[in-house]
């Protein structure tokens, strides 16, 4: 559903930010 898509997108965004901060 839409919530799953939103959660997946949010998780991806958080991972991207975390990776950016770690570097």
Curated annotation (Swiss-Prot):
Its main location: secreted. It comes from the Eukaryota. Expressed by the skin glands. GO terms for cellular component: extracellular region; membrane; other organism cell membrane. The modification Asparagine amide is found at residue 23. GO terms for biological process: defense response to bacterium; innate immune response. The keyword Membrane applies. The keyword Membrane applies. It is found in: Secreted; Target cell membrane. Keywords: Amidation, Amphibian defense peptide, Antibiotic, Antimicrobial, Immunity, Innate immunity, Membrane, Secreted, Target cell membrane, Target membrane. Belongs to the frog skin active peptide (FSAP) family. Alyteserin-1 subfamily. Antibacterial peptide with amphipathic alpha-helical structure. Shows selective growth inhibitory activity against the Gram-negative bacteria E.coli (MIC=25 uM). Has a weak hemolytic activity against human erythrocytes (LC(50)=200 uM). Is not active against S.aureus (MIC=200 uM). This is Alyteserin-1b. It comes from Alytes obstetricans. The lineage of its organism: Eukaryota, Metazoa, Chordata, Craniata, Vertebrata.
């Amino acid at each position: 559903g839409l919530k799953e898509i939103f959660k997946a997108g949010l998780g991806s965004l958080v991972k991207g930010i975390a990776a950016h901060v770690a570097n």
